[in-house]
Amino acid sequence: MAVESRAVSTPVPQNSQEQELILVKVEESRSWGQKLKQSGSARSCQELFRQQFRKFCYQETPGPREALGRLQELCYQWLRPELHTKEQILELLVLEQFLSILPEELQIWVQQHSPKNGEEAVTLLEDLEREFDDPGQQVPATPQGPPMPWKDLTCLGAAQEFTHIQRQPLKKQLKPWEPCLPPKSGCENNESAIKKDISGEKSQRLSQEPSFGGFSEHKSSLEWQQGSAPGETLRRSPSQRASFSPVIFTHKLLANRDHPEPQRNLILSTNSVTYQKVPTEERPYRCDICGHSFKQHSSLTQHQRIHTGEKPYKCNQCGKAFSLRSYLIIHQRIHSGEKAYECSECGKAFNQSSALIRHRKIHTGEKACKCNECGKAFSQSSYLIIHQRIHTGEKPYECNECGKTFSQSSKLIRHQRIHTGERPYECNECGKAFRQSSELITHQRIHSGEKPYECNECGKAFSLSSNLIRHQRIHSGEEPYQCNECGKTFKRSSALVQHQRIHSGEEAYICSECGKAFRHRSVLTRHQRVHTVK
């Protein structure tokens, strides 16, 4: 595999002063990046820098060179090329764009789970297994009748640019609600009429919209289709939430038969992508907390559970509760053993589609998540996160009983069973219980007689891999256990322990009949026969 480049191409500074400034910023950013990595807050800060980069306005700087420099700085702080590989940076950009194209209802749900990459976002959506009432509503584009009012479309920057839309430089500081219209041309009279029309609709609309920090939040769902013809259907695009900018580009639908031809040509010449707003009467149910609207009251009720934390769907088996019935259905497959998703390669079945997707990577050998420290690759980002704790020494999971910490939650759960005495894994044959599933699997080989570990030298098979390792030392002659006192070596650690009792004088095995002590259990066993004969 080729060595991954971590460089991000940026415009070259025009003078030495700018170059020195950028170098200082890079060094400060690297130093701060290490602190963030240690404190565990890098994720939230990365999101903050992303928002600052996307919301940055030209009017915040005195000139174009300063604006470009500030954008470079914000982009560097967001994407962190000194910490991330080229593939990881691309993953961040793809994830951002993927979230932006989701329907509104899914956007909110996925963002609350904070996926770290596109694979995690897809897994969340597949686990949801719920069809929304209006995932991609088809709305007819009817040019007949009165023109529909338009909401504002916030400028989102390079990652969400709309092709063929001409963006003109602004001559003054615009207010959040002030439209950016095309430059004056021969149709000045038509433009003034357009401005008046848009301004009238805007003033009526602003009184009804909530305000957040001085900016109007534009929640409308926009219908888009490039080069659409009358009567064709348009696909709904989600609102671009959390992107407020003083530079607002307003696109007004004037290409209807009630306007003169010059007016229609003026608008369509500056915007070859046609938009259409879903009428508000089709979404009469509005959330009082976040302002999202829904077609049906049941959809609003389900959405409000995000804010209230209500979980009305309870499992009859274990009592666990869920906010959606689809979650409960997925959970109940644990108890029923139903596995509806089957691998076409090996036939193995799973109870969730996301589990099947992860399993398929075993067959494809795909390992897209690579460790920057040692280069080891993993099929899932969660595996990479756990692996990186080896390098960082991070152990975020702490036992409340004894304070011992662990790098994985599963290890903490197993450890806590020492304190609780819980043994959840029970053998169906003899009823013996174990703390870990691996112990149960090993035990069941006693009943089944299975010996999956075979010696390549002599063909002898064993039920435990540790037994095979010890056996192979017979062929290799390896004796890894050495006595510190005399230097003698042994194949097994137990043999070394017994040998060390010669030097220490320890006699660990005591006869309960006469009190005589022995170094080896086998010697004690032979001695006890003396008492048995009597």
Curated annotation (Swiss-Prot):
Signal peptide: none
Cross-link for Glycyl lysine isopeptide (Lys-Gly) (interchain with G-Cter in SUMO2), residue positions: 55, 171, 202, 252
Keywords, comma-separated and alphabetical: DNA-binding, Isopeptide bond, Metal-binding, Nucleus, Phosphoprotein, Repeat, Repressor, Transcription, Transcription regulation, Ubl conjugation, Zinc, Zinc-finger
A Gene Ontology cellular-component term: nucleus
Record bears the keyword Zinc-finger: yes
One example GO MF annotation: zinc ion binding
Subcellular location: Nucleus
Location of Phosphoserine modifications: 31
GO biological process, one term: regulation of transcription by RNA polymerase II
UniProt record similarity statement: Belongs to the krueppel C2H2-type zinc-finger protein family.
Function: DNA-dependent transcriptional repressor.
Name this polypeptide is given: Zinc finger protein 397
Originating species: Bos taurus
Gene: ZNF397
